[in-house]
Amino acid sequence: WLASFLPGYTMTYSSAVAYLFRLQKHGIKLGLATMTALTVRLGMPQTKYRTLHIAGTNGKGSTAAMAAALLQAAGYRVGLYTSPHLVEFRERIRVNGEMIPESRVAQLTEQLQALCQPDLSPTFFEYTTAMALQHFADSGVDVAVLEVGLGGRFDATNVVTPMACAVTTIALDHQEYLGTTCPSIAFEKAGII
């Protein structure tokens, strides 16, 4: 990864993904300060299209995928951001069902790496969320469907002003971050509204 700081170096997909996974050392940091600063440095890409924001304990990924498919069938150009990936990183970011190209992952990783210097240390999820928001803007999507990663109120995806929100079923999950009762967890997830 040190090579990425050498003049003339062009990041490859494999080095980009390796860099991204090293960001997991930052763990989970709930809060919007880093994500807000990062999107400002990117020029607020999330304001270039409409968003549908989906939170919940179970079924949010399926709900997001179905919503994206319905919007695409209606003739919209649709971005879809989900997590986690099952096989490869690029599954997380799609436009009209097509995974983000490897070359774009490398370009955006390099771009974000430069924008984070010297004072931002985003988590893996913040970084990939910013990458998705920028890719959707650059791809000219009409609408982006965003699946919340954890909770909602302080999730990295909550830098958008959605045209609509959905909250799927609520159950006890991530209690160390969201609270120990269904009402407290529902409060956190409803934070996207």
Language model region names:
Residues Y9, H26-I28, L32-K48, A73-V160, ...:
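ATP-dependent carboxylate-amine ligase catalytic core
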Residues A186-I193:
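Membrane-proximal helix-turn-helix segments that form the acceptor-binding/catalytic region
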Residues I54, S62-G79:
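A conserved segment at the C-terminal end of the G1
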Residues V159-T169:
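Inter-motif core of Ras-like GTPase G domains
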Residues M11-H26:
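Charged, amphipathic alpha-helical linker segments immediately N-terminal to NTP-binding catalytic cores
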